[in-house]
UniProtKB/Swiss-Prot annotation:
Composition bias, Pro residues: 82-95
Name of the protein this chain belongs to: Beta-1,4-galactosyltransferase 1
Pathway: Protein modification; protein glycosylation
Gene that specifies this protein: B4galt1
Domain of life of the organism encoding this protein: Eukaryota
Subunit structure, as described in the record: Homodimer; and heterodimer with alpha-lactalbumin to form lactose synthase. Interacts (via N-terminal cytoplasmic domain) with UBE2Q1 (via N-terminus); the interaction is direct.
Keyword Metal-binding: yes
UniProt modification remark: The soluble form derives from the membrane forms by proteolytic processing.
Chain segments annotated as transmembrane: 25-44
Organism annotation: Mus musculus (Mouse)
Residues reported in the UniProt entry to bind Mn(2+): 251, 344
GO BP terms in the entry: acute inflammatory response; angiogenesis involved in wound healing; apoptotic process involved in mammary gland involution; binding of sperm to zona pellucida; branching morphogenesis of an epithelial tube; cell adhesion; cell population proliferation; cell-matrix adhesion
Amino acid sequence: MRFREQFLGGSAAMPGATLQRACRLLVAVCALHLGVTLVYYLSGRDLSRLPQLVGVSSTLQGGTNGAAASKQPPGEQRPRGARPPPPLGVSPKPRPGLDSSPGAASGPGLKSNLSSLPVPTTTGLLSLPACPEESPLLVGPMLIDFNIAVDLELLAKKNPEIKTGGRYSPKDCVSPHKVAIIIPFRNRQEHLKYWLYYLHPILQRQQLDYGIYVINQAGDTMFNRAKLLNIGFQEALKDYDYNCFVFSDVDLIPMDDRNAYRCFSQPRHISVAMDKFGFSLPYVQYFGGVSALSKQQFLAINGFPNNYWGWGGEDDDIFNRLVHKGMSISRPNAVVGRCRMIRHSRDKKNEPNPQRFDRIAHTKETMRFDGLNSLTYKVLDVQRYPLYTQITVDIGTPR
């Protein structure tokens, strides 16, 4: 009996002492675990190594390792070296050598400068679609009136999308037609006002990526339309990578915005039915007034001739060049291709060229050495107005 009491008394004391020591050990291990966890959290180290360092089984971790710790889906692990997510409302501290600023590139040797990074926007993330082949903005036949008063300042305010120098591109689509419109010019300010008044809205409705270049011949020597067009081609390419060139007289206005001021697979004659000629084509070879050539087509014929001083002949020479290079002329129908001409008397120093018929007869020979490869001129002034760019040039004198 005494033996039993001694045994029971001893056994009652032993479990209490043992449990107390076990609890102290468990508290110490938990404190160590908490301390190591805190240190690793603040330093951004990999928490997946904690069980190996503290020697605590996954059962004692209580699900703080792996996917459960970062709320990751089962089977996914945080990459080695990745920072654990901070508590809600707490911003992560930068890591020396890795984070130079919030949002910096996370990797050694990578530099970040927030001021140089583009700010993501809806338009920046989503690329614009290509403009449709036929613009939905066209209205068709239009009334052209040359008796209205035109104020260029007011016109510029009504067309805020036009950039300085007469540059425009659609804001809601990307146009494949990068068009430079070249106007040979001298002393036609009133005509230019009407041209800008009517053409800018038309070109915008056609959804073209375009620029307007007025090539102004300085001095009072004989006018040379074709040479000015060559100059316009070269000068426009200094501004932008145009792929199409429309060559337009300043006194011609289209009466239908379906008459496209752009390039096609073949050279395009745009002013096919002028009121001056009773809204009909004067002759099959006629290529004057307004025409369009792609960059490749223009280069293939060595540009336009430089030796047609005075009125007439150069458009027929251009037609011959195209035919000799195996090209054909594309035209709109006589309804869409209607144009109005601003009536005016013939300019001084633009009298008919008496040599034009002889020169036209020899186009096949002269086109090899008369054109872009023989073009000489001097730019005297460049003015970029709100609605157009004017380039004043000295083109020399007839030889």
